[in-house]
């Protein structure tokens, strides 16, 4: 009986541990992402793919659609590494193919985990 109580206690404790899931490619972003009409992701992708000679470093806004209020921009984050324009084009194409229309993030590295580095398209305060 004592062993059963120990097993049940262990199973209960294990069930209470938080489940951690890596957030892979996704169409998440600011709450304002849903307010925009049209398919801005394609415009962002086309800008980036039209200028593949650029280097994209963390925080630099390389492709953007500027609006009167907020704007949408693509940038690298969650890493210290830069990526090539060709890589940026590939990641933005991944987002378009995933069905993202305005905002989203694509992991930079194998493992589909954006916490290790990501190319993000999201609303920003200014161009």
UniProtKB/Swiss-Prot annotation:
Q: Which cysteine residues pair off into disulfide bonds?
A: 27-100, 33-103, 49-89, 57-82, 66-127
Coiled-coil zones: none
Q: Does the keyword Disulfide bond apply?
A: yes
Biotech use, in short, is:
The KP4 toxin expressed in transgenic plant can render them resistant to KP4-susceptible fungal pathogens such as grass smut fungi. Successful tests have been made in tobacco and wheat.
Any single GO molecular-function term of the entry would be: toxin activity
The answer, when asked if Repressor is one of the entry's keywords, is: no
Location(s) in or outside the cell: Secreted
Q: Which residues form the signal peptide?
A: 1-22
Name the UniProt record assigns to this protein: KP4 killer toxin
Q: Which GO terms describe its cellular component?
A: extracellular region
């Amino acid at each position: 009986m004592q062993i059963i109580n120990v097993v049940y206690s262990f199973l209960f404790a294990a069930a209470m541990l938080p489940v951690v899931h890596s957030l892979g490619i996704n169409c998440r972003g600011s709450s304002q992402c849903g307010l925009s009409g049209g398919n801005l992701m394609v415009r962002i992708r086309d800008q980036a793919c039209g200028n593949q000679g650029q280097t994209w470093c963390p925080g630099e806004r390389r492709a953007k659609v500027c609006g009167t209020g907020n704007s949408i921009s693509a940038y690298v984050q969650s890493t210290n590494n830069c990526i090539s324009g060709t890589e940026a084009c590939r990641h933005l194409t991944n987002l378009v193919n995933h069905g993202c229309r305005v905002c989203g993030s694509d992991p930079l590295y194998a493992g589909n985990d954006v916490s290790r580095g990501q190319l993000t398209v999201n609303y920003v305060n200014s161009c």
